[in-house]
């Protein structure tokens, strides 16, 4: 199946949240590893389906940010994603506390528990509103980047379409392309600065709400860094 043929349907958020809650309850009530494993596979299937719909909306919105249908879908996902993250966090906690943890680790490896512990440090219901605001700002940034229409040598190009000219063998042409791109960024400097400033303050607030000194520690956790730390990076 081609990507363009993959069906998209906005999920019923309340129904999906209830499905996750039911799976979590069943998982906690499991009396054997076989029973817990069966619920685990159900949760994986549901999670993959929901994530597929989210990714379809995101990619198709990126392909054409002027598409009003997927623009509306991104508005939905910007609000829905933090709520679904709360469901995932509850599931991760159930996995971490499971009496069958050793059985899961024996079959699937311990990495998923390492990642679950990291994810648990990166989330709290206290930052749900900030997460939704962050998603909207990131969407706004993507729209701004996609809106670029840069005049160059009689044509009009997007940022990606201008890239070949920036790598042209001719020095003068390369320089002109870089200057054309720079002029566009300069023209929209206030918009970029506004998004950046809001994100910095928003993420700093998120980090502090979770008990960290700022965003850096939270940022490492959110990126799922499981094999090196901020201290390791500072050595370089």
Question: Which positions does each model-derived feature cover?
Answer:
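Alpha-helical coupling/stalk and coiled-coil linker elements that connect catalytic or binding modules
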Residues: 232-236
